[in-house]
Amino acid sequence: LKIVQRETVQKAEIIIGVTNMQLEKLKGKGIEQLFEAILSLETIEECYQFFDDLCTVNEMQSLAQRLEVARMLRKGFTYNQIEAETGASTATISRVKRCLNYGNDGYQMALERIGK
């Protein structure tokens, strides 16, 4: 049991390290300007206007789908239920689950703030 636990901890540390590396790669590449622009938006209508200019319909649907997958995973839905409800692939569901378990708590923070 201790060997399995140690391997699980090591895998988690590797995943956390990868997640933090991804975050570090984002910094300093114009991302802060994007985040500042998003934070400047004051209404849902402004969000629609900005994201309509910034993203394709498919990109927006993908982002919304990932957030819904995160919400459903937090509520205890199964992969099959999530796939049937959202159309997300098991790869997408797995990636979101990995972020929920080992990421930077971004999904949790956002979903808690919007009451989901």
Feature names for model-found ranges:
Residues 45-65:
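Short, Lys/Arg-enriched anionic-surface-contact patches
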Residues 81-86:
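Short alpha-helical "recognition helix" segments of helix-turn-helix
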Residues 97-100:
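DNA major-groove recognition helix of helix-turn-helix
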Residues 104-116:
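Short Lys/Arg-enriched helix C-cap and helix-to-coil transition segments
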Residues 63-77:
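Short, amphipathic alpha-helical "recognition" segments used to contact nucleic acids or chromatin
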Residues 1-41:
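General nucleic-acid-binding
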